[in-house]
Structure formats: structure tokens, C-alpha cells
Amino acid sequence: LIGQFLYPKFGPGQLWETVAEKVQNMGGEIRMNARVIKLNQSENGKRVESVVVESKKQDGSFVTETIPCDYFLSTMPVKELVAAIDSEKSKVPEDVRQIADGLVYRDFITVGLLLDKLLIKNPAKSGTPESKLKFVADNWIYVQESDVKLGRIQIFNNWSPYLVADPEKVWIGLEYFCNEGDNFWNMTDEECIRFAAKELASMGVISTSDILDAHRERIKKAYPAYFDTYDR
């Protein structure tokens, strides 16, 4: 897709860790395990005056708090942003509210596998050391096979060597596109990992006996979908 690009040493999360550090160094506060559930507007409905935040406590219970604000910058999905606006003072037209409510998102699951090796390698060239053939050169591989659910493979070693503690091992991510609440989303971690490993083995990319560790992550609303009410 592209020949060269910049990438954080410890992955994209490092970017936001740096942003968070700078915000806190400047006196800002970051609320973890919290989400905005309501926007309170001024009487004329032209600005946001405060937000209602729901925070999760250590005992698992939730508490709400109203926080005044001078500026409000949103990274919420549009669907949730419009739904959170105080309906009593809302100036959001009904057709806009209906469009926002009908927006569709694709959810995402990634299964990480730590491997002793991949079965696929770079093409051998005369005089090339075996160690140089251990990994394919790609950062990601898009999967075209119609008989598997897998959408894309990431090889984290090739993103940054600092993402893998042991450079002799291979750390890959298997990416699946799904919908929150569907059968694939509702699999247990163990079921999902077994499913992903079986698919990759069926493609000849790995042997399941080479799996050293595994992890599954769910990501809600990873991608906006350009259909349903989006066209309106």
C-alpha cells in the first residue's frame, strides 16, 4: 500500500500515552473508566454548558457526575453524540436525529498469537542466512480466501522490533470484522482463539503446535459503515 511511513516505537498506543502525559503535565485531568452519557445545553441550545459523566468504581458500581465545561470536543460516535444531547433543550432536527440513530458501525476483534515461527517465509535467495527468512516482509496481509472469516493478518515484528520481547519469536494479530452481539462476538476468549488458530492453520500459515500464547481483544464501533441512513 505504501513504501515507507512513520510508526511509534512501541505501537500507536504510545502516541496517546504521550498526549495523556502532556495533558497531565499541563494540569489537565483524565478520567479513566468513564464515559459521557448526556450533554446539557444552554437555554438557547447553542452551546454545551456541562456534561454528565458515568464512572465505574473499583467495586464495579457506577456513579454519575455533572461537570461544567468551557469547551467541548467530542470523539464520540455520531450516533451516541446526538443521542446524548439533552432532549428538553435540543435544537437537533428530528430528521437529523433519525439519521444519527440509523447509522451503522462495524465492530472488530483481533486475536493475537505469539508463535515460535510462521510456516510462510520470504523467498530464499542464494547466500541468504536462514535467520533472514524467518519472517515475511509484510506488515499486514489481506486475506482473500472465501472459506475463512479472517480479514487481515498483522505481523507486529515488522511494525517495530520493540513490540516483541524475543526477536526470535513471531507476534501476529488476526483481524475479524463482525457486529457486537453476533455469534462470533459472543464467543469466549478460548473459543475465539481456537477458531482463529484453526483458520490460520488451514491456510498453511502456522502450525497450532507453534502457538506459545494468545490474547483476544474486542473493539466496538471500529469502522463507520457507509450505508443505511448514511446516504441521507
What are these regions (language model features)?
Residues R31, F108, I206-R218:
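A short coil-to-beta-strand element that immediately follows conserved catalytic motifs
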Residues I2-Q4, Y176-D182, R218-A222:
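Short, local alpha-helical segments
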Residues I2-G3, I99, A137, K149, ...:
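Glycine-rich, flexible loop/turn motifs
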Residues P8, D210-I211, A222-A225:
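Proline-rich low-complexity regions
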Residues G27, T75, L150, T208-I211:
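A generic structural signal for alpha->beta connector loops
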Residues S160-P167, I219-R232:
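FAD-binding beta-loop-beta segment adjacent to the flavin cofactor pocket
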Residues P8, A34-G204:
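Mid-domain catalytic core of redox enzymes
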Residues L1-Q41, P68:
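Active-site/ligand-binding neighborhood in enzyme catalytic cores
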